[in-house]
Curated annotation (Swiss-Prot):
Residues 244-265 are annotated as: Disordered. One of its GO terms (biological process) is tRNA pseudouridine synthesis. The keyword Ion transport does not apply. Keywords: Isomerase, tRNA processing. It is an enzyme of class 5 (isomerase). This is tRNA pseudouridine synthase A. InterPro entries: PsdUridine_synth_cat_dom_sf, PsdUridine_synth_TruA, PsdUridine_synth_TruA_a/b_dom, PsdUridine_synth_TruA_C, TruA/RsuA/RluB/E/F_N. Belongs to the tRNA pseudouridine synthase TruA family. SUPFAM superfamilies: Pseudouridine synthase (SSF55120).
Amino acid sequence: MPRLKLTLEYEGTRYVGWQVQPNGPSIQSVLESGLERLLGARVSVASAGRTDAGVHASGQVACFDSPRVLPMKAYVMGLNGLLPPDVAVVDAVEVAEDFDPRRWSRGKRYRYRVSNRRTRSPLRRMTHWEVFAPLDVEAMRQAAAHLLGRHDFSAFRAADCQAKHAVREIRSLAVEGTSGDAVSFVVEGTAFLKHMVRNLAGTLVEVGKGRRPASWVAEVLASQERKRAGPTAPPQGLVLEEVFYRDGPPARTPGGTTDAEEDEG
């Protein structure tokens, strides 16, 4: 039974998130339903990350064991013909039988988008956080520099985050765009805590609005207290852009876990 790795793109507005839940449609549920129709049997799908309600993806990764052997094109084109228009398979490849989309990950890249023009945008309302005030891009870049590296990000985790610890590594955090139009925070890290990127975005916007100096972000990080950071940015601005992989499962220290196994992003 071959194991297939799917790369997915979806517009998450009408979904309760990745994971199957009783209160509405999820990305996982519509994907598993489409696969059942395509393959004639029920399959279970695992993902690289559990995106929240309203969050989008251009590079989510999922995998499943296929009860039938089909050409790769059939998995892509056939499944896309069965999925709703806001979910699509971009690519399908066969992988090792022990491939795990979360555990084998060596990192992810997210983009958080903010519309900072003074008037609302009908075209951005489902894909950006609209703040209606020009943001200081340079100040936010200075603030973002304090977040690079490996730190305890307790100040940026959700209250109900289940991760055993809050130590994570941010490899890069770029602030792109233009004051008075649209700005993006592009963050790449080994793993993420629940709501971590949205909390980082909310904190950087506080600096961009001039409410706090760039140095305040370093103080928030050192405090390890969620109440010291900015608000949680809304979900519609967040996109999971890419999941990065190694050639095989990551090495583990005796009795320890890898960053990927602790990932809640």
